[in-house]
Amino acid sequence: MAARRGRAKRRKVCYFTANGITHIDYKDVDLLRRFISERGKILPRRVTGTSAKYQRKLTIAIKRARTMALLPYVAD
């Protein structure tokens, strides 16, 4: 059987743990936009590499920002 060839998967690192961010503020729209798709959906952990703890905080912050009309619910 032939050996599988391809790129070695790079371990994704949590952005918040790596940069020492402990509080995710819903008013920091530039940070939150990094974790939203072009369609306006929240990107999953397997795509972003965010840890479970910070993914929960991130989700709450994004939903709060949407409620305050800082982020759109859907893309234009």
From Swiss-Prot:
Annotated keywords: Ribonucleoprotein, Ribosomal protein, RNA-binding, rRNA-binding
Pfam families linked to this entry: Ribosomal_S18
Segments traversing the membrane: none
Keyword presence, RNA-binding: yes
Gene Ontology molecular function, alphabetical: small ribosomal subunit rRNA binding; structural constituent of ribosome
Any one Gene Ontology BP term: translation
Gene Ontology CC annotations of this record: cytosolic small ribosomal subunit
HAMAP family cross-referenced by the UniProt entry: Ribosomal_bS18
Role this protein plays: Binds as a heterodimer with protein bS6 to the central domain of the 16S rRNA, where it helps stabilize the platform of the 30S subunit.
Protein name: Small ribosomal subunit protein bS18
